[in-house]
């Protein structure tokens, strides 16, 4: 009896163990089949690239986590001697400048990849779109850009005088350009700001939360399935059916305040109604009134995209312009000489800085080219019928292909043999260069400048970013004489989704004859 019981017990254990083996074996076979189908994906077998990347997106995730993706990408193209590199089971990096128009042009049939899903904000448990039809030039002209720009420049100069110039203290300019950018874009978006410059730091943890959000997006961008598992899985939706991101809730409160304000004006006279601020929040609400299908969640998505494009990414460009201008004294001297020939009001008006100060404009263009703000590529998905690339190779439909702005921006055939260097002169006519040849060279550089994207899906925040950059750079150098605390040291560049530079501490002084009284 005892022996029979023991035998039965062991048989049950063996049966359970065998079942576990079968389950594990089935899972292993499924994974093996999945990875082999990835490796032998039709049309991509012959595209060179890292061996591991042909099986799984984990290779790209690891490179992003290492903060090496941008640095390693050019080396991959060089070592394989190929303009097409397979960096994922169904993902290809392209370094051929001839493909810019094919992939991103106005007549392209390429669609956006799953990248946009990982970038979308969460509101009430649902992802919200962030793309908004760009307003025409008349609409942009109605937005209170000049007022916002003047306010922000005056504020930052006052704070620099109070905190750094008079006390002779070092200024962490890498942080202050972000405070400036955030306050300015908030002024343009909702005609008020959160007071980053006044506080001299973060307010209510907004910048800290934004950084965490952008870091997460960098990881989710490398492997989109992480986002589906982490944020949008059924368990998370069940326990948090109306979850919203911290930043999304901040945008929600901004919109609610504006809606209450505009509703209070609806019953007033026409003259009083005309006093409504023509900022981005007003334009978003106007769009919703004309098209009721636009939800509050979509409005929050629009606003969030506006704030991110106009703050974090803009700060990257301004830091780059300041850093390289101070690192190369000849650039600083030539810029100051150009600024000294200007006798108009300060802050320098946008149109003058953009179109009448060629060397200042060249510095900004070079900063945009030299330091592409994002770690990732601008991804697109090939049309169902597939596509023939400029080198004659054919890619099947449904493949994600992209170009990295840094990779194209450093193409020597387009930007010159010194494409790895910071040289604003490349954007200007060379001594003795015929005008026709200069214009041809400039057109080629413009056509391959991906700083704000390219084609119909280019960055809708371009106008906002340019407004901030062209307002800050000339006014800062016209009034301030900066010098690095440790000029022999290089800055520190941190990367995940958006690059963040630091290590730019400097001493500030007013230039001779300049001061707060110089501001209009």
Swiss-Prot record:
Topology of this chain in the membrane: Single-pass membrane protein
InterPro entries noted in UniProt: Cyt_P450, Cyt_P450_CS, Cyt_P450_E_grp-I, Cyt_P450_sf, Cytochrome_P450_monoxygenase
Record GO biological process: terpenoid biosynthetic process; viridicatumtoxin biosynthetic process
Keywords associated with the record: Glycoprotein, Heme, Iron, Membrane, Metal-binding, Monooxygenase, Oxidoreductase, Transmembrane, Transmembrane helix
GO cellular component: membrane
Practical and industrial applications: Viridicatumtoxin and its derivative, viridicatumtoxin B, exhibit anti-methicillin-resistant Staphylococcus aureus (anti-MRSA) activity. Moreover, viridicatumtoxin and a C2 acetyl analog, spirohexaline, have been demonstrated to inhibit bacterial undecaprenyl diphosphate synthase, a potential new target for antibiotic development.
Cell compartments where the protein resides: Membrane
Transmembrane feature ranges: 16-36
Positions with a binding annotation for heme: 459
Knockout consequences: Impairs the production of viridicatumtoxin, but accumulates a new naphthacenedione intermediate, the 8-O-desmethyl derivative of anthrotainin.
E.C. designation(s): 1.-.-.-
Origin: domain of life: Eukaryota
Major localization listed first in the record, in broad terms: membrane
Pfam families xref list: p450
Gene Ontology MF annotations: heme binding; iron ion binding; monooxygenase activity; oxidoreductase activity, acting on paired donors, with incorporation or reduction of molecular oxygen
The protein, known as: Cytochrome P450 monooxygenase vrtE
């Amino acid at each position: 009896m005892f022996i029979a019981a023991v035998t039965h017990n062991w048989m049950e254990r063996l049966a359970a163990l065998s079942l576990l083996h079968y389950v594990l074996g089935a899972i292993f076979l499924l994974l093996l089949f999945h990875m082999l189908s990835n490796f032998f994906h039709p049309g991509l077998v012959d595209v060179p690239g890292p061996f591991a990347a042909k099986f799984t997106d984990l290779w790209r995730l690891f490179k992003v986590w290492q903060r090496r993706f941008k640095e390693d990408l050019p080396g991959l193209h060089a070592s394989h001697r190929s303009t097409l590199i397979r960096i994922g089971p169904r993902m290809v990096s392209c370094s051929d400048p001839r493909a810019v128009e094919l992939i991103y042009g106005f007549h392209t049939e390429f669609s956006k990849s799953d990248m946009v899903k990982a970038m979308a904000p969460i509101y009430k448990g649902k992802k919200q779109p962030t793309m908004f039809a760009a307003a025409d030039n008349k609409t942009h002209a109605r937005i209170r850009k000049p007022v916002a720009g003047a306010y922000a420049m005056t504020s930052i100069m006052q704070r620099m005088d109070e905190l750094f110039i008079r006390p002779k203290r070092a200024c962490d300019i890498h942080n202050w350009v972000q405070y400036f950018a955030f306050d300015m874009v908030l002024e343009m978006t909702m005609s008020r700001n959160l007071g980053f410059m006044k506080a001299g730091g973060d307010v209510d943890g907004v910048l800290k939360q934004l950084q965490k959000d952008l870091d997460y997006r960098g990881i989710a961008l490398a492997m989109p399935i992480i986002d589906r598992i982490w944020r949008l899985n059924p368990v998370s939706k069940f326990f948090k059916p109306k979850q919203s991101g911290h930043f999304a809730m901040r945008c929600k409160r901004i919109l609610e305040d504006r809606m209450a304000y505009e509703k209070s004006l609806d019953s007033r006279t026409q003259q009083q109604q005309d006093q409504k601020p023509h900022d981005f929040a007003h334009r978003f609400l106007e769009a919703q009134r004309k098209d009721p299908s636009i939800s509050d969640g979509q409005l929050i998505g629009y606003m969030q995209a506006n704030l991110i494009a106009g703050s974090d990414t803009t700060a990257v460009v301004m830091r780059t312009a300041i850093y390289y201008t101070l690192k190369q004294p000849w650039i600083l001297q030539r810029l100051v000489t150009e600024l000294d020939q200007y006798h108009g009001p300060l802050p320098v008006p946008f149109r003058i800085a953009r179109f009448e100060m060629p060397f200042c404009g060249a510095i900004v263009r070079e900063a945009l080219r030299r330091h592409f703000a994002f770690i990732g590529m601008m991804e697109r998905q090939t049309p169902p019928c597939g596509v023939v690339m400029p080198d004659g190779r054919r890619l099947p439909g449904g493949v994600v292909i992209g170009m990295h702005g840094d990779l194209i921006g450093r193409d020597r055939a387009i930007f010159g043999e010194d494409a790895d260097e910071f040289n604003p002169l490349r954007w200007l006519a060379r001594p003795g260069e015929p005008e026709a040849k200069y214009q041809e060279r400039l057109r080629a550089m413009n056509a391959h400048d991906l700083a704000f994207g390219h084609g119909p899906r280019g960055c809708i925040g371009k106008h906002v970013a340019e407004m901030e950059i062209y307002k800050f750079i000339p006014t800062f150098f016209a009034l301030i004489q900066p010098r690095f605390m440790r000029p022999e040291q290089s800055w520190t560049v941190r990367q995940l989704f958006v690059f963040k530079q630091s290590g730019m501490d400097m001493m500030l002084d007013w230039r001779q004859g300049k001061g707060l009284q110089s501001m209009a």
